[in-house]
Amino acid sequence: MRPEEFEIYITCVPGLEDELLNEIQELGCKNTKLTSGGVEIVGGWHDVWRTNYYLRGATKVLVRFASFRVVHLSQLDKRSHKLDWEKLLKFRKPFKVETVCRKSKIYHSKAASQRISKAISDKLDAKEDPNSMILVKARIASDLCTISLDSSGEGLHKRGYKTATGKAPIRETLAALFLRKMKFNGSQVVYDPMCGSGTIVIEAAEIALGLPAGRQRNFAFMELPSFKKNEYKELTKVEPKKNKLKFYGSDRDTGAILNSIKNAKKANVETICRFETSSISGTTPPTQEPGIVLVNPPYGKRVGNRKNLFALYRTLGQTLSEKFVDWQVGIITSDPGLAKATGLKFLDISNTVDNGGIKVQLYKTKINHPQI
């Protein structure tokens, strides 16, 4: 590790770390290490900027700042005061501290946060503010304290374009990783027949155009002394790719379609996105060329009564089986019983992953011929 380099920990939805690793390696990051809940890399501030700006599947980018053993609060106080906080944070810039304690002699997370906060305040003449974008995270596990800086600010699923959401939204980061699971690379048509606010369709369109995920938002690292605006501008210059494909969504709810159109316009992908009002039974392939259907139907835990959803899933399965021959199909659901109700023969079922507090899986198949 060179003097200007440090450890960077990039988190994602647990269960999809392998897809995040692939994306990070495609970005050209080196010294990658797969871990539970994310990927570790070694790099400098340019890598922090790039990973925040370009990665579609990442949840947060954390900068590892210090690591040391502690067994009591006075020791934590002493070690925290010795750290070079001025290299990480600005003088008199408000900040906040969060601490998690696991299997350690120090077990009071609030008291630990207070010690670290005082060290920063004493060094930088800065005040702690719960509303600050600058978050210092401490993890004390088995008496090892690791201090990191959240360089992202708001979660990276917040792309900066969405003004309207539906009843059961899927996070943009999860949509991007599931698109990768479907082997989408920007050269296939994508259709979501229950598109809600258009997340899956818009993610697919952005990928096809090569648009960076974070191009419409700000990040916490912009408030650090290490940030160089001109260097960042050079690092994030990108020309959109030319793409002749269109990406499609439909929904029976006219309000959802209007939201999708608004969101696509704000994301600047409205020219290659098409949305229309349609029931599942009335759904037809948007193109003659087969592509990918990726759909996040309602599940009983979030929208509606589970019993009423069986008919919906049955209709979805029949429609896909009869009309979407040669299409790749991915269905996201929390309920194996509802997946079974489609009548489709699934070739692969993903790990269980979290979607807004609900455990879901991706059920994949290819419609080679009518299956029902």
What do the PLM-derived regions correspond to, one by one?
Residues 170-285, 302, 307-310:
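Conserved S-adenosyl-L-methionine
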Residues 46-53, 154-157, 371-372:
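Short, charged/polar, Gly/Pro-enriched secondary-structure boundary elements
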Residues 1-132:
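Non-catalytic nucleic-acid substrate-recognition regions in nucleic-acid-modifying enzymes
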Residues 136-152, 363:
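C-terminal edge-of-domain segments
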